């Protein structure tokens, strides 16, 4: 897939309701599987449906489909083989069969807590389905094994039809996060406010959404073959921006005299507008593709520092505490630097 592909309004709408889309896909897959079972009169017809739901339910993005498909099919086949061996051992010795099943379930539990949890889960599920057959009825066990494999293949087929891309979902979520960040930024530093706004819940939501995006990094990297380090860098900067915004708000509203000085710094306000424009350009790039690097205008920041020094001299009689003022300016400079780095990383992520 092209990483710089422009997102259509329809795609954005679909991906914003991806849980509804995935639920609809699972429902249609269940109905079609049920009709296939009835049409061909497949024995032990419960197990393809059970397997399809177990396998298809957790899969959502295309980056997870292919690797997990092999995990699931491998787990299903191995579980079937272990189950058939267990049924043969039961004819020889029940204690030996129990030891064999215990060893197989130990393998299931061990894999379930490793890098291939779904494979371990399906080994255990398939083993339980197969050994649940009546004693000595190998035909029933074979049908159950085949039904589980059939359910696995159908689940992979339905998941691969119009799959959702984790990379596109990541782009939309990052654009949404930056948009919300811009709104909170404007609300916190609006010159029309007389008192500090209560934005704690909004900041917490920004941080929570940033943490949730980490789950998209692995499948997005597999889909685009873009190194995970780029996604991790964007993730870190996104989280840092939220943390620095909270510190900026604290410094901006620290004391009334210092807030009055910052409020009257015209060049500092110009810097705030510059950062808002950078955020808007990043959001536009994430939706439209083909981004251009953003270079911060550090001269505006230097001019703002000089202006603040003059304002402090003019308001020397107010005994203004300088620490919040210079802390706020430094945080502004660091925020602009972080946005510049974020722009460069987004350009690398949205390359052709």
Region spans (language model):
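A membrane-cytosol interface segment of integral membrane proteins
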Residues: 240-247
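Long, hydrophobic alpha-helical segments that serve as membrane-spanning/inserting helices
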Residues: 1-23, 169-234, 247-352
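A transmembrane helix-and-boundary motif of multi-pass membrane transporters/channels
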Residues: 1-210, 217-218, 222, 341-351
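Secondary-structure capping and boundary motifs in well-ordered enzyme cores
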Residues: 74, 78, 233-237, 267
């Amino acid at each position: 897939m092209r990483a710089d592909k422009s997102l259509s309004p329809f795609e954005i709408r679909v991906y914003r309701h991806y849980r509804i889309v995935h639920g609809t896909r699972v429902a249609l897959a269940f109905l079609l599987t049920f009709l296939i079972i009835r049409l061909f009169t497949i024995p032990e017809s419960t197990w393809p449906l059970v397997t399809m739901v177990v396998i298809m339910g957790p899969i959502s993005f295309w980056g997870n489909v292919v690797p997990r498909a092999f995990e699931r099919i491998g787990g299903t086949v191995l579980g079937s083989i272990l189950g058939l061996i267990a049924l043969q051992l039961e004819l020889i010795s029940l204690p030996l069969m129990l030891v064999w099943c215990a060893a197989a379930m130990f393998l299931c539990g061990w894999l379930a807590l490793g890098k291939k949890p779904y494979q371990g889960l399906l080994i255990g599920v398939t083993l339980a389905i197969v050994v649940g057959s009546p004693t000595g009825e190998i035909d029933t066990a074979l049908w159950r094994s085949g039904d589980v494999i059939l359910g696995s293949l159908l689940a992979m087929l339905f998941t691969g039809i119009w799959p959702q891309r984790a990379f596109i979902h990541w782009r939309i979520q990052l654009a949404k996060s930056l948009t919300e960040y811009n709104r909170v930024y404007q609300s916190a530093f609006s010159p029309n406010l007389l008192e500090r706004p209560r934005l704690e819940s909004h900041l917490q939501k920004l941080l929570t959404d940033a943490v949730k995006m980490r789950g998209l990094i692995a499948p997005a990297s597999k889909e685009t073959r873009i190194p995970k380090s780029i996604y991790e860098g964007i993730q870190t900067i996104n989280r840092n921006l939220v943390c620095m915004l909270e510190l900026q708000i604290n410094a901006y509203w620290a004391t009334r005299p210092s807030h009055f000085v910052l409020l009257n710094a015209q060049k500092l306000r110009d810097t705030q507008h510059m950062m808002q424009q950078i955020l808007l350009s990043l959001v536009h790039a994430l939706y439209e593709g083909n981004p251009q690097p953003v270079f911060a205008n550090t001269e505006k920041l230097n001019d703002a520092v000089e202006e603040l020094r003059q304002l402090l001299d003019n308001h020397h009689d107010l005994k203004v505490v300088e620490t919040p003022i210079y802390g706020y300016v430094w945080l502004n400079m660091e925020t602009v630097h972080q946005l510049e780095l974020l722009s460069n990383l987004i350009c690398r992520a949205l390359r052709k």
